[in-house]
């Protein structure tokens, strides 16, 4: 989903201010301040967390543009038939790569392999790619539009790569036409998901209930940006690292290299297989910069919000405390935990201003209080959830809750998706975004769950290792690939196409709970194509004693959302799962559990909208745990 679409689906009304400052619909990167001290980076990959964690108080600097360096994930597989091929990336280079592989064009394959990390080439148009082919003496394989050849008399060079461009649901798709004579433009696209591969046994791992003691090798750090040198890149002015290290340099590459050298020194000194770098709002600055530049350094890899030191195999976890804390900024976070009022400005207009700041302020004090806050925060989470340690792979509060429940229940028969095919299938089945019908205005009203737990406690959740089938069994939990057709009189469908929510005919992935709900609501034609199904199911949230102790014994806190405890319980009760859905592919996750949690909530919400009091209302936006209406 493009950045503009995600902003439109957001609960916050931030799109209009962004457009005022120059944001365009095709932009995919935003640099903006949120207050006098904090600069963040918004991309298509972190915008769900932006709208969850950030409160925009003051925009004093704003810049947006389209960057070819931003790579977004796509849960769909390519469309590959006998007559045509459509890459899910929409990249023309991927069409050339596919043709080189299928037709065994070794010269073209070698040329493409040498350009694997060339983002500009990957996003090139037909003219630019043909220039590249000419440069490499490969013009025989040039891209030619099917509209420019005579199909009837077959008067075209068979070595050329024939391309068609179609518009489906308002989007343009590039197609490699394999068979010019037999080809017809598809009316609608069925993006396939490899469900058979997703169910392969080694793509699912047992959920470990072990947890390590709190890692002692924890270091707070911050990146400080400067804004004067370029419009389309963040310039790192300095890096602060606990306890008192200040890293500066000639340019971004030099500063990051010194930073990585410092980390390497820590790794060898501590002789540990893991260390933890912690901070606040890392997702919106530090992680984005590291992911952008780390490929330049052969001894390091950035993967799944962590750095890996190739020589030793040491993992450097990047732990963003903001994900486990109410919406705030670094100043408010430190004040909450230490009572200390400090400025935490993370950007300067000029390099000279940053240099003056470093010379005239105690950076060591700043980083010390951030370190102290992070330690107290993590220790508080351990105490509240009665953990024996802390896992820096925890994706969010729901992840911690489910882990603690499983430990209490001592149930070890849950498998989580590990391989990208299985992860992508689970993500495709989770519908947490808004179905937006109209814009929010001053007359809009919101209906929000105070607690989702009465809905999800009675529900069943997958257990065991899933298997493949085309005929799901009644009473079993499954996730199905379906062809769906929606009646035109349904304004707010429970089954919809994520890529184009206005589509009335599409292929989608839904849980058995979603499908059962749609059947009961009526107005849907559903054809199940294939499924992933679980052999067993359990009531995960039926440990009443533990949940009562967790929520009821802390009820005094739940009325005060400014306290950490109050925020934790309010957040969990309302069923917010943004960060858990964004769980990294290599980490332990709860995606199949979350998929059914969301489905049980959607089941209740959409049935509620059938009640007369809401049926006559004008629904503006709707998602699993809230409805906005007029």
From Swiss-Prot:
Pfam family, one: Pox_F12L
Post-translational modification note: Not glycosylated or contains very little carbohydrate.
InterPro entries, sorted: Poxvirus_F12L, TF_DNA-bd_sf
GO CC terms: host cell endosome; membrane; virion membrane
GO biological process, one term: regulation of DNA-templated transcription
Sorted UniProt keywords: Host endosome, Late protein, Membrane, Virion, Virulence
Localization terms from the record: Virion membrane; Host endosome
Superkingdom of the organism of origin: Viruses
Main subcellular location: virion
GO molecular function annotation: DNA binding
Protein task: Late protein that plays a role in intracellular enveloped virus (IEV) transport to the cell surface on microtubules. When absent, viral morphogenesis halts after the formation of IEV particles, and these are not transported to the cell periphery. Important for plaque formation, extracellular envelope virus (EEV) production and virulence.
Family as reported in the entry's similarity comment: Belongs to the poxviridae F12 protein family.
UniProt-recorded name of the protein: Virion release protein
Species the sequence originates in: Fowlpox virus (strain NVSL) (FPV)
Phylogenetic classification of the source organism: Viruses, Varidnaviria, Bamfordvirae, Nucleocytoviricota, Pokkesviricetes
């Amino acid at each position: 989903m493009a950045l503009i679409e995600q902003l439109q689906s957001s609960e916050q009304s931030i799109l209009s201010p962004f457009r005022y400052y120059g944001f365009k619909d095709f932009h995919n990167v935003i640099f903006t301040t949120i207050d006098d001290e904090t600069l963040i980076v918004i991309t298509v990959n972190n915008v769900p967390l932006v709208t969850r964690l950030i409160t925009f108080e003051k925009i004093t600097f704003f810049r947006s543009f389209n960057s070819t360096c931003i790579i977004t994930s796509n849960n769909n597989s390519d469309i590959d038939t006998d007559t045509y091929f459509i890459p899910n990336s929409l990249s023309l280079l991927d069409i050339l790569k596919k043709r080189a592989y299928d037709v065994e064009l070794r010269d073209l394959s070698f040329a493409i392999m040498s350009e694997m990390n060339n983002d500009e080439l990957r996003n090139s148009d037909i003219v630019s790619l043909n220039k590249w082919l000419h440069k490499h003496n490969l013009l025989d394989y040039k891209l030619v539009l099917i509209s420019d050849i005579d199909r009837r008399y077959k008067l075209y060079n068979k070595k050329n790569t024939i391309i068609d461009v179609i518009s489906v649901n308002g989007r343009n798709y590039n197609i490699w036409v394999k068979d010019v004579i037999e080809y017809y433009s598809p009316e609608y696209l069925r993006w396939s998901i490899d469900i058979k591969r997703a169910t392969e046994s080694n793509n699912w791992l047992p959920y470990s209930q072990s947890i390590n003691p709190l890692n002692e090798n924890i270091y707070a750090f911050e990146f400080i940006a400067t804004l004067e040198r370029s419009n389309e890149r963040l310039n790192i002015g300095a890096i602060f690292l606990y306890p008192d290290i200040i890293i500066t340099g000639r340019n971004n590459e030099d500063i990051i290299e010194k930073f990585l050298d410092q980390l390497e020194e820590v790794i060898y000194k501590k002789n540990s297989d893991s260390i933890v770098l912690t901070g606040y709002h890392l997702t919106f600055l530090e992680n984005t910069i590291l992911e952008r530049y780390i490929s330049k350094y052969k001894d390091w890899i950035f993967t799944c919000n962590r750095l890996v030191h190739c020589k030793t195999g040491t993992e450097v976890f990047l732990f963003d405390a903001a994900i486990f804390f109410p919406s705030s900024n670094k100043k408010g976070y430190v004040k909450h935990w230490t009572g200390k009022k400090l400025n935490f400005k993370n950007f300067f207009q000029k390099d000279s201003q940053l240099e003056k700041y470093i010379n005239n302020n105690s950076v060591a004090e700043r980083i010390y209080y951030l370190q102290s806050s992070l330690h107290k925060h993590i220790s508080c989470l351990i105490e509240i959830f009665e953990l024996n340690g802390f896992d820096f792979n925890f994706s969010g509060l729901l992840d911690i809750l489910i882990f603690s429940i499983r430990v209490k229940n001592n149930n070890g028969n849950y498998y989580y998706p590990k391989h990208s095919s299985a992860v992508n299938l689970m993500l495709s089945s989770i519908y947490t975004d808004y179905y937006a019908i109209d814009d929010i205005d001053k007359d809009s009203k919101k209906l929000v769950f105070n607690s989702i737990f009465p809905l999800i406690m009675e529900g069943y959740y997958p257990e065991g290792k899933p298997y493949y089938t085309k005929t799901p069994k009644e009473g079993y939990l499954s996730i199905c690939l379906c062809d769906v057709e929606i009646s035109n009189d349904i304004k707010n469908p429970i089954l919809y196409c994520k890529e184009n929510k206005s589509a009335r005919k599409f292929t989608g992935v839904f849980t058995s709970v979603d499908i059962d709900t749609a059947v009961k609501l009526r107005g849907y034609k559903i054809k199940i194509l294939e499924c992933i199904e679980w052999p067993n199911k359990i009531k995960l949230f039926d440990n009443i004693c533990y949940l009562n102790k967790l929520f009821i014994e802390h009820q005094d806190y739940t009325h005060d959302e400014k306290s950490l405890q109050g925020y934790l319980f309010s957040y969990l009760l309302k069923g917010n799962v943004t960060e858990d859905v964004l769980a990294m592919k290599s980490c332990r996750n709860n995606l199949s559990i979350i998929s059914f949690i969301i489905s049980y909530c959607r089941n209740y919400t959409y049935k509620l909208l059938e009640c007369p009091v809401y049926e006559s209302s004008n629904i503006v936006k709707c998602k699993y745990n809230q409805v906005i209406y007029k």
